[in-house]
């Protein structure tokens, strides 16, 4: 898998974003743009449940598609386990988590995992997480769009 080459890279001090069954190409394009803007190392998606490159995705990525490696993997849980063996902390985003995203230590090797807007992370993927965190949003608002949440998380991790 492409993952092996990227995991072994010396550039792995930056964060990765992992998407679990995010299927909207415009959301993925916007997430690619945010990853590029906030200097994430790579985006990882499951091959089977993620859209292929399309005009809608490229348009939403706004010229940043070539700036970010997109790793397509067969088994997301196993791929996250491989990242953990390479020293990454697997951090799942969960609106009901006790810990706030601002409590994460910056500068480490993080693999931030985000699930689909409807179902969130699948159980097996969530079980690979070392911890889960949430974005502190108004309790009257159920959630954010996944691409918006990704941008906020990447910004928070990129702050000095």
What are these regions (language model features)?
Residues 36-37, 58-64, 123-160:
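Structured adenosyl-cofactor binding patch, chiefly the S-adenosyl-L-methionine
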Residues 23-31, 75, 144-149:
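Amphipathic alpha-helical repeat scaffolds
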Residues 1-8, 12-13:
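Single conserved hydrophobic/aromatic residue that forms the stacking wall/gate
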Residues 20, 46-47, 68, 74, ...:
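Short beta->alpha connector loops at strand-helix junctions that form conserved
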Residues 14-62:
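Hydrophobic, well-structured mid-protein blocks that either form specific transmembrane helices
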Residues 40, 95, 103, 137, ...:
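Short, conserved catalytic or interaction motifs in soluble domains
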Residues 41-99:
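Histidine/lysine/aspartate-rich catalytic loop segments that bind and position anionic ligands
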């Amino acid at each position: 898998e492409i993952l092996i080459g990227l995991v072994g890279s010396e550039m792995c001090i930056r964060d990765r974003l992992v998407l679990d069954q995010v299927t909207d190409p415009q959301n993925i394009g916007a997430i690619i743009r945010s990853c590029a803007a906030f200097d994430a190392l790579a985006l990882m998606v499951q091959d089977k449940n993620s859209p292929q490159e399309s005009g809608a995705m490229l348009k939403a990525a706004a010229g940043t598609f070539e700036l970010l490696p997109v790793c397509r993997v067969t088994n997301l849980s196993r791929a996250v386990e491989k990242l953990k063996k390479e020293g990454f902390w697997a951090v799942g985003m969960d609106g009901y988590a006790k810990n706030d995203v601002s409590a994460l230590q910056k500068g480490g090797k993080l693999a931030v995992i985000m699930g689909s807007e409807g179902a969130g992370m699948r159980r097996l993927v969530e079980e690979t997480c070392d911890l889960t965190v949430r974005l502190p949003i108004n309790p009257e608002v159920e959630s954010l769009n996944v691409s918006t949440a990704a941008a906020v998380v990447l910004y928070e991790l990129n702050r000095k």
